[in-house]
């Protein structure tokens, strides 16, 4: 009786400790997401237009968002290794640190009028996005069973204020030097985000998650190959990664070229900033509701709903004339909602499909594939708009959602973990 009682007391103490740490983790991640969201929002609103202005080429303009997304993909690799070897705090601090350096380089490039240097800066700028994406997984390390999507969605939702405010601030930076000021402001907020997670994310949630298994140390040798093995063994993990990748690729491709499309209709940076802010609100604002639906009704149905929303977004935005700012905004809000369904439900499904000690590897692999696909999508989007049209890009994205939707219909027969 004494042994059983002692064991129950220890379990209760451990549960209370994990719950207390989880509350702190969510608070710190929320602060980091708000700050990081401001910087990323600034870059999203201005990047395409600045690159096009510096180069005089719409193709190079499309490469701006592609560079940032490619940077996020590349930085996800060392970030995943840091998570596996040192914990979430090191990985997130590294990502925001790279974003700080990249924003500073982009500011200097805008000041000196060098578009190659600007694109190089945006590669590093993508580190902040990589940190933001990794933060959503950090929120699930200590989640109670059946609550991963809700905890994850809180961190995604935390990006709303910053990400909506960022594009709006992009049109108010004349006093800081116009385009240069946009990236100087991003430099400052990324530095604050790095400081917040470095100081505040103690104890590390991934280390605490290993307490229940009797191992306080994080297994040190976890590569992306480990993530591939997880995908090979788990059908639900494969479905999750595919849905995440398609959702993010479609979102980046359409969103990155919408500012150029609206610019052809005479829209200024302020108007574009409002449209992008509405889009980002669609991405983040309803994510807690998306997370609740995913936990209550299953991940796959929410993923399927996300593909339907992405298809509707492609139709609405694709039919918008360059002067139709309102219609384009509606299309981008739908695009954001579809993305939210894909990222929240897909990330939760992936997390629950892998053991805790293998999660950093498969999560890092997912972010690599997600951002790599989006980078390719951004390149293709720029070429399609330059050689064909914005409606042609929308039609291609509509076709992209059809096979993924079909796969998800079939995947509903799979038992979720």
Language model features: what each stretch is:
Residues 97-112, 309-322:
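C-terminal ends and interior cores of transmembrane alpha-helices
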Residues 47, 130-143, 341-354:
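Intracellular juxtamembrane helix-capping segments at the cytosolic ends
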Residues 2-23, 202-241:
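Juxtamembrane intracellular "pre-TM" segments in multi-pass secondary transporters
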Residues 34, 115-130, 327-341:
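Hydrophobic core of transmembrane alpha-helices in multi-pass small-molecule transporters
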Residues 112-117, 145, 155-201:
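Helix-loop-helix hairpin linking two adjacent transmembrane segments in secondary transporters
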Residues 75-88, 174, 285-299, 385:
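Helix-to-loop junctions at the C-terminal end of transmembrane segments
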Residues 121-158:
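Cytoplasmic helix-loop-helix junction between adjacent transmembrane helices
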Residues 187-212, 407-412:
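C-terminal membrane-cytosol helix-exit motif in multi-pass small-molecule transporters
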